[in-house]
């Protein structure tokens, strides 16, 4: 199980209810299968009125269940000893949320839910409805009740007065998190990612080619494993807290605040600026040579090591960095990940994971390398 196949060997029951968002479930089924899962669709009558069962039969490669028969499908999948590993109710209407919360099972979906909850198997609910329905006190109370039972409720996107179904990637990440054992449950992780940009003038910046792919992969892997994750960067990663910064100074401030709030891990995957120019007002005229003086900037990693007692992972970029990496290990870094410049912006590459007592070379995609890093830390 590695890279994109995090759900290999897992069976997910995709229970579909009568929200217009049911049109997204074909894509969702494909994504879960791409990640390795066996997917079995179960549909309410209302869902069948929006999307034909044949569409989900095609998307899953298994005949969609539209009614519970004498074969007791709900027990075969979600009962004691059943073959399913997780029940995913997506989309989930206000009506179905209320029925699950009160033990009512008068549709195939709610019957599967009652059975799954009685067995104690993981359940993920993905609400989708108009915003006014989502704000109804009874719906709010019912969702809180589901969460108190251990059900994972995936927050909707509030747009255009609608509580729209969460993105496909976000739903898949919640499924992975529910099925991977959560070895990082209760842990707080702070990760820096991507490039900083130091203003040269009001138009131009000094930056690097870093894309943030490694930081993103590390953050998503930590989330899958159950951690509470904060990413300090200029981009966006789903399912985590995103703290947006531009300059190295802003990153320094955000990181020190983050690790000071009880963090357990700090992973320094950003290409933090080493130098910054004095910012010129307006726009420097073009057409003539320009000399730009650069001043060195304080190191974020050094500042973290002075105040943070948790686990620190650093990254070193270069062709001959292992001697410097050894010095970083002596300074208190738990692991140094060494990679070469060609890996910057690429989908993968060769990385060396260095610890005081071990050295391991990992070659693969950045998602696979992130998995290897967290596996080594745990």
Predicted regions span which residues?
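A cross-family phosphate/adenosyl-ligand binding-site feature
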Residues: 1-378
């Amino acid at each position: 199980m590695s890279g994109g196949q995090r759900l290999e060997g897992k069976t997910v029951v995709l229970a579909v209810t009568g929200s217009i968002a049911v049109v997204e479930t074909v894509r969702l089924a494909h994504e879960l299968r791409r990640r390795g899962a066996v997917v079995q669709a179960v549909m309410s009558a209302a869902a069948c009125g929006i999307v034909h069962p044949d569409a989900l039969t095609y998307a899953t490669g298994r005949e969609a269940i539209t009614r519970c028969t004498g074969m007791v499908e709900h027990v075969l999948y979600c009962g004691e000893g059943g073959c399913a590993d997780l029940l995913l109710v997506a989309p989930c209407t206000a009506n179905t949320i209320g029925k699950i919360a009160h033990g009512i099972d008068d549709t195939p979906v709610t019957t599967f839910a009652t059975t799954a909850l009685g067995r104690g198997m993981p359940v993920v609910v993905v609400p989708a409805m108009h915003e006014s329905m989502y704000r109804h006190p009874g719906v709010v109370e019912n969702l809180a009740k589901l969460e108190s039972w251990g059900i994972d409720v995936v927050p909707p996107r509030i747009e255009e007065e609608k509580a729209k179904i969460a993105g496909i990637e976000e739903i898949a990440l919640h499924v992975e998190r529910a099925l991977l054992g959560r070895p990082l449950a209760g842990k707080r992780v702070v990760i820096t990612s991507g490039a900083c940009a130091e203003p040269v003038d009001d138009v131009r910046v000094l930056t690097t080619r870093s894309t943030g792919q490694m930081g993103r992969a590390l953050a998503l892997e930590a989330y899958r494993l159950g951690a509470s994750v904060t990413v300090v960067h200029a981009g966006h990663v789903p399912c985590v807290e995103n703290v947006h910064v531009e300059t190295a100074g802003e990153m320094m401030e955000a990181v020190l605040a983050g690790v000071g709030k009880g963090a357990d891990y700090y992973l320094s995957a950003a290409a933090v600026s080493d130098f910054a120019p004095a910012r010129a007002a307006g726009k420097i005229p073009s057409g003539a040579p320009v000399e730009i003086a650069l001043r060195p900037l304080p190191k974020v990693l050094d500042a973290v090591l002075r105040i943070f007692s948790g686990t620190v992972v650093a990254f070193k970029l270069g062709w001959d960095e292992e001697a410097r990496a050894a010095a970083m290990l002596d300074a208190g870094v738990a692991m140094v990940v060494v990679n070469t410049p060609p890996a910057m912006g690429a989908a993968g590459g060769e990385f060396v994971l260095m610890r005081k007592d071990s050295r391991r070379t990992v070659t693969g995609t950045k998602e696979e390398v992130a998995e290897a890093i967290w596996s080594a830390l745990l």
